[in-house]
Amino acid sequence: LVNATAVHYQAMARQTGTAVDILLDIPEDIGRISDSELCVMIGDMLENAVTACRGVDRPFIKMRSRCADGILTVTLDNSYSHVRQNADGSFRSTREGGGLGLRIIAALAEKHGGGSRFEAKDGVFYSSVYLRLM
């Protein structure tokens, strides 16, 4: 299911001329993390990236995952044209009515003993999430 989710967003991004580079190395047994939770996390990350790349001269998305020592790490770097940040440094949705993507990603990471970090710098939005598998 995770691969199908990634392929869906990869195709969507490529249709808009975005360069996409996705390498996911996720083991069959991901411990206590459900397939649906992982699909939501990967899907939200990629959906945000595809949306952020609109209006960028050279749009790109690069996603990687790695599993080591019982920890799954997923990183995603993408170009962006516009971000909205709150005074506390957290990010606000650019979507009409607001979005929950980053909050859902962070909540899933915390639920599984992990964490998340999001940063926008010099036209690149960096997302990194880690989850404990056991």
Name each model feature, range by range.
Residues 70-103:
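Glycine-rich/acidic phosphate-handling loop/turn and adjacent ATP-lid/helix
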Residues 113-123:
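Glycine-rich ATP-binding loops of the HATPase_c
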Residues 56, 60-70:
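Short beta-strand/loop element within the Bergerat-fold HATPase_c
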Residues 104-114:
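Conserved glycine-/histidine-rich ATP-lid loop and adjacent helix of the Bergerat-fold HATPase_c
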Residues 35-58, 107-108:
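Conserved ATP-binding N-box helix of the HATPase_c
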Residues 19-41:
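Conserved short strand/loop->alpha-helix "switch" segment adjacent to the catalytic nucleotide/phosphoryl-transfer site
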Residues 1-16:
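Short beta-to-alpha transition helix within the HATPase_c
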Residues 82, 121-128:
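Glycine-rich nucleotide-binding loop
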